[in-house]
Structure formats: C-alpha cells, structure tokens
Amino acid sequence: MKWALKRHYSERDYMLFLIGIHTGLCVSDLLQIQTKTIVKLKRKKIKEFKIKEGETKKERMINLTSIFDEVYSYAQTLENTWLFPSRKGDQPISKIQAYRQLQKAGDFASIESIGTHTMRKTFGYWFYKQTKDVAMLQDILNHSTPQITLKYIGINKEEKDNILDNFYI
C-alpha cells in the first residue's frame, strides 16, 4: 500500500497514510495537523506534539521520531496551512477525499476493504504484534477495554483461526 501511494499517487496521500499507520490517529485528527506544527518541532529539536483528539476530546502525544525526517521534508515543500491541503482553498482535504484516495491506492495494490480506519487498525495491529502490550495500545487508542482493542485490530479472530487451523483430536 505504501508503495502504491508513493509511486503512483501524490506525496500528500502517501504522507497521510504514512503518518496514519505510525500514529494510529483517526483520519479526522490527521487532517487537522498544520504544517507549522511540524516546522516548529524541528526548531525545538523535538519529534512529538500534543493533539486533542476529536472523538474523545482527550489530549494525546503524537511521536513522529521514526518518520520525522520524511514528514519534515514534506512539510517544507508546502505553502499551505494544512499538512494535507485541498486544492480548493486554504483547507485540508475532506474525510471523503481521504477515503477516495485510499480506496484508489488499495485498488491499485489489489487490497480489498480499505477505509479511513485502515491506517488506525494497521497501527494497532502492528503495535500489538511488536510489543504484545494490549494495555498500552488500549490507552493509545483510547478504548475502554482490552477486549475492544483486540477485536478492533482483528487479533481475536486471527488467534482463534490459528488455533482452530491446528486443532485436532
């Protein structure tokens, strides 16, 4: 998916996906990030910033350390307020436009069922696979229970399928 976006779509769409899968933010929160936020981080020599999540209204630290140089290089190319600018005036792209671009890239990469939550779920899935820390992931995603978090990222079904695939009496 990253390859399809990087090679065949705009840098804006690639960066939206890259930041989405590395932060687990909802698309509505991603679209509100301003270019100056990234530029200020470089000046302050830090690679994380606070955001107030739209759905939960909770503040969260967003860490971009692993992708900061790439995000900063992209931000420097923009002459717009928004990190993911629309071509229609000084505003970010809409959630619908983000969805359309992800759908097109998914079709190109032969990936079915791509949506705007795909980035958040991908982050959650790989965070859990790498750390096995469901409590921390639950906190990051602001879920009320570990069970909701595991169901959201598809782990329960995957683990159940793996067990049943090898189950024999």
What are these regions (language model features)?
Residues 38-42, 133-153, 158:
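Short, polar N-cap/turn motifs at the start of nucleic acid-interacting alpha helices
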Residues 5-8, 99-139:
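Short, basic (Lys/Arg/His-rich) helix/loop patches that form interaction surfaces
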Residues 54-72, 82-103:
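C-terminal catalytic core of Y-nucleophile DNA break-rejoin enzymes
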Residues 1-23:
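Basic, Lys/Arg- and aromatic-enriched nucleic-acid-binding interface segment
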Residues 32-64:
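Conserved tyrosine-mediated DNA breakage-rejoining catalytic core shared by Y-recombinases
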Residues 16, 28-33, 137:
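Alpha-helix N-cap/helix-start motif at helix boundaries, enriched for small hydrophobics
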Residues 51-56, 146-166:
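Catalytic-site neighborhood detector that most strongly recognizes the C-terminal catalytic loop/helix
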